[in-house]
């Protein structure tokens, strides 16, 4: 499980065995079942999660009770309610497992300690943050400038393996269309 994390980090920076042992000591392993919540709205967010196996959805529930899927995350991706995590405030998003999911968790204190102690790790997390911002910017621009079919085709092009795994009803909700409309896109 930790070897997956090492390979992920070493796509960005190289680590000696001693450095990785230090990194590894700051994470804990958690396992969740399908439909189980990793984070629930209203809770304090204690961790950022590296997904070793499984699939999750990040969801916001508006005042009328409607669910809005913000993102999906699968293996080799990081997920959390990052605002709540970094500010140590209550979550405005829920993170729910679509499949049985195994994660490596890092607390904010351990994250800060690792970044202070190992400049390489700080560089790694900075790059992850930059790519996360790019993904969020692309998502917003897509919502503003593309129709649902164009968003579906872009998602299919960028993340074909994700589209294959996410249930069609959730994919439709993410795209803001009915399941029937999504079926027409697929044909």
Predicted segments with their positions:
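Cyclic nucleotide-binding regulatory domains
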Residues: 37-97
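Phosphate-/nucleic-acid-contacting segments
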Residues: 146-187
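A small-molecule sensor/coupling module
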Residues: 91, 110-147, 151
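Cyclic nucleotide-binding regulatory module and flanking cytosolic helices
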Residues: 1-28
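Residues that scaffold the ATP/ADP-binding catalytic core of kinase and kinase-like folds
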Residues: 59, 81-82, 113-114, 155, ...
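Localized chelating/binding microdomains
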Residues: 14-16, 30, 102, 142-145, ...
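Residues that recognize and position ribonucleotide moieties
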Residues: 30, 49, 71, 96, ...
